[in-house]
């Protein structure tokens, strides 16, 4: 059964086309991974099929009474709402049904026997619906999902405005999973999850009987939950049966076959053109030349897609710092309340340390405390000598209106325009991206702009807060290579073991010293 039908979809921003004549059908129960390079339009695609964005052309038709659930990290959570109330709101439609049933029972004393029988039938139907949807197990379901996502530890009575960005996303995800919509749309759900919660989400999605479309650059996660791949590339959407690894196998084979056919055809075109040029003027061979020309004119010329620019990250290293990068003495981090016990930490030159642990336990706060951006509640941080620090924040300020060129020029005013454009191009950004405002770019493209600032400055210590979030597979692989080759020290928050395996010299589990668990 088809639950979504898309026909001849075309859309773009200004003179930049995102899709051209895309058509597909989504069937009940399909588990789809939506993949493609940064900037190909995956999130735009989600916004279009959910009606948040009107396409330039095309028809989008959902089956009747299909419930669509979309993990939108920008949904407003207002003060006064608790974790528990947001999660329970997933069942508002059931509470409405219960109220309707209670209203029916309240009317029974005021009606005749025939009307009473009708009302009792209605109430019975509603009761069956409530039972079918496990209405009387709502509290147990809320507890199960809250525990699985690490929200139970925070307390279901906690106000949502006191949560970190990652924790708020978990609350929204929990609500969405409890709603069990007919089609679940998830845009990079693992960005704010630690390993334990990702494992739970894998199990949940594998058991999910309804359909879902998942955007993710986490390949092991994709491989474990999807049975179809939709590949967005060069304004088209292609469907592949199987997981991501199977898709790559078929895609590379098709690409090699197309290149072989292209090369063969180009050789044939060259020979035909050469024959026509040599023989069209001679009376004896003019007819043969005209025949070859007709063949050329009728030929369906194979075109190869333009190669996507692949990023090249090469970090510049500053002078050698002192032995210690930093030392902490009785450091207690936090805002109004402490997030940690008293910490006595030290990092030596050459170490590449990864901070792990659940969201909201203080990993980002530790980075900011070391940098002096947040004052500790008690204790001190002593920075080493001759440090040249590079800092990568988890998210950028979305109110900034500068273009990519202006962002880099503001950071490096001595650069010529050629140097600015070259620096951005090396990070995998095209001319159209470079001239756009940073805030209109995809999350992955924004991350590449911020990485561009880092790699063009000499550093000897990098503090990186979830640098892999939003990056596509090629960019992630290149970043890992560059960080492995980096001669300086690294302190990095990361939730992807596949990324930091073989890169980290040490892994610090922050759950051992947090006060939040």
Task: Give names to the regions the model predicted.
Residues 250-300, 305:
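Intracellular alpha-helical coupling/juxtamembrane segments of multi-pass membrane proteins
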Residues 1-260, 309, 318-517:
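ABC ATP-binding cassette signature C-motif
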Residues 313-315:
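Post-kinase regulatory C-tail/linker adjacent to protein kinase catalytic domains
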């Amino acid at each position: 059964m088809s639950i979504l039908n898309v026909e001849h979809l075309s859309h773009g921003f200004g003179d930049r086309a995102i899709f051209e004549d895309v058509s597909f059908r989504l069937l009940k129960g399909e588990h789809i991974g939506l993949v493609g390079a940064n900037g190909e339009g995956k999130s735009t695609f989600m916004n279009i099929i959910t009606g948040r964005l009107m396409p330039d052309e095309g028809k989008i038709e959902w089956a009747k009474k299909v419930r669509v659930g979309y993990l939108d990290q920008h949904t407003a959570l207002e003060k006064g709402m608790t974790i528990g109330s947001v999660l329970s709101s997933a069942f508002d439609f059931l509470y409405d049904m219960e109220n309707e049933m209670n209203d029916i029972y309240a009317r029974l004393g005021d009606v005749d026997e025939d009307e009473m029988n009708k009302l009792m039938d209605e109430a019975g139907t509603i009761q069956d619906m409530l039972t079918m949807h496990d209405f009387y197990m709502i509290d147990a379901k809320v507890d199960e999902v809250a525990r699985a996502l690490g929200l139970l530890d925070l307390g279901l009575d906690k106000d949502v405005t006191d949560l970190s960005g990652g924790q708020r996303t978990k609350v929204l995800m929990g609500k969405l999973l409890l709603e069990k919509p007919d089609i679940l749309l998830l845009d990079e759900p693992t960005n704010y999850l630690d390993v334990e919660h990702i494992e739970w989400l894998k199990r949940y999605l594998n058991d999910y009987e309804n359909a879902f479309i998942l955007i993710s650059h986490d390949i092991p996660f994709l491989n474990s939950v999807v049975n179809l791949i939709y590949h967005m590339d060069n304004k088209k959407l292609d469907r592949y049966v199987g997981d991501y690894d199977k898709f790559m196998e078929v895609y590379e084979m098709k690409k090699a076959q197309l290149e072989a056919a292209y090369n063969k055809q180009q050789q044939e075109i060259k020979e035909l053109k050469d024959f026509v040029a040599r023989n069209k003027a001679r009376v004896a061979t003019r007819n043969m030349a005209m025949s070859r020309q007709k063949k050329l004119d009728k030929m369906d010329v194979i075109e190869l897609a333009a190669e996507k620019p692949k990023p090249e990250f090469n970090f510049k290293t500053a002078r050698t710092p002192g032995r210690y990068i930093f030392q902490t003495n009785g450091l207690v981090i936090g805002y109004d309340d402490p997030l940690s016990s008293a910490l006595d930490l030290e990092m030596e030159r050459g170490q590449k340390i990864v901070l792990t642990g659940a969201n909201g336990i203080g990993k980002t706060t530790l980075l900011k405390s070391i940098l002096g951006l947040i004052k500790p509640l008690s204790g001190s941080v002593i920075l080493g000598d001759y440090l040249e620090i590079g800092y990568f924040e988890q998210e950028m300020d979305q109110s900034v209106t500068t273009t990519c060129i202006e962002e880099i020029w503001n950071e490096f005013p001595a650069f010529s325009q050629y140097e600015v454009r070259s620096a951005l191009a090396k990070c995998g950004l095209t001319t159209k991206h470079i001239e756009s405002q940073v805030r209109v770019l995809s999350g992955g493209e924004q991350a590449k702009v911020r990485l561009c600032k880092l790699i063009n400055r000499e550093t000897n210590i990098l503090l990186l807060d979830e640098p892999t979030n939003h990056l596509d597979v090629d960019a992630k692989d290149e970043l890992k290579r560059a960080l492995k080759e980096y001669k300086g020290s690294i302190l990095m928050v990361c939730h992807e073991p596949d990324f930091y395996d073989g890169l980290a010299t040490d892994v610090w589990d922050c759950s051992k010293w947090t006060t939040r668990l």
